Amino acid sequence: MELIFLGTSAGVPTRSRNVTAILLHLQHPTQPGVWLFDCGEGTQHQMLNTAFHPGKLERIFISHLHGDHLFGLPGLLCSRSMAGPPHPLTVYGPQGVREFIATTLRLSGSWTDFPLQIEEISAGDILDDGLRKVTAFRLEHPLECYGYRVVEHDKPGALNARALKAAGVTPGPLFQALKAGKTVTLADGRQINGADYLAPAVAGKSVAIFGDTAPCEAALALAQGVDVMVHETTLDASMEEKANARGHSSTRQTATLAREAAVGRLIMTHISSRYDDKGCQRLLAECRAIFPATELAYDFSVFPV
C-alpha cells in the first residue's frame, strides 16, 4: 500500500496546500485498487496531478461532514459519471452523508451513471474484502467523526520447496495444496502436512487514518501498533488548549499518541493556514522531539506503508 496526499491544509486551502483528501493505493499483484479518504473542495482537480482518475476509485471513506473534508464529493461524483465505464462505487461516512449526497445532486439537477452505494456507519468493522479489513473508530470532534484502521490480512509463509523435494514430493499441483496448508497423500500412501513446510505467516501492513479529533480513548485503539499513523497536527504545542476546544490536537499530543501506540511512523497533516514553511518545520520539530519517526505531509507527498 501507499498513501498519496491530495490535500493537507486544515479548514481552508492555501497557495500550497489544498484541504483534506488522501488516496490509498492498494498495490496488490492481482487485485489492485484505489480508495479515497475524505474529499475536501477541489479534490478532483488535485487528482489530475496524479496517475489516478476518479473512475478508478472503488471506495470513499468520509471522516465527518465538515466542509473541508466533504465539499469536493458532489463534483467528484458527477465527474466520475463522465469518466468511462460505470464501475461501482461505495461511499462510507457518518449519519447524514446520504442526505448530503442526495440533496446536492437533486438541487443541482445532477445524477450518477454508475452503481452508487452509500453506507452510513457506526464504530466497528465496516468492511472485509477478503484481502484487508477496515474498522471505524469514533473520535472526539464537534460533529460525528471517525478514523479508519486498514489492516491487510496476513500472507502465507513461503513453502520450503527444497525440503519437500527431499521428501519425494514432485513440484506441481501438490505444491499448491501444501502452500494452502492442506494435507496431501502421496502415491506411496504417505501423508504430508503443508503446515509443516511453511514458514511463519507474513504480517499484513496496517495504517490508521484519523479524522479530526481531540485526544480521546479510541485514538489509542485505532493507532495501536500500525505501520503508519496519519494524524492531524492542526496547531503547535503552545496552542494546545485552543486546539482541544475545537476538537483538534496539538503537535505534542499527536506525537505522544504515536509513541504510546508504538506505531512505525507518524505522518503529520491537516496543518493550520497560519503556518508558513518555516512554521511547518517548527511543527515537525515539535513532533520529532517526542517521536523521531515523524514525517510532514505536503500536497502530493507519497509515502509507502
Swiss-Prot record:
The active site is at D68. Zn(2+) 1 binds at H64, H66, H141, D212. Its EC number is 3.1.-.-. GO terms for molecular function: 3'-tRNA processing endoribonuclease activity; exonuclease activity; zinc ion binding. Binds 2 Zn(2+) ions. Zinc phosphodiesterase, which has both exoribonuclease and endoribonuclease activities. Belongs to the RNase Z family. RNase BN subfamily. This is Ribonuclease BN. It comes from Salmonella paratyphi C (strain RKS4594).
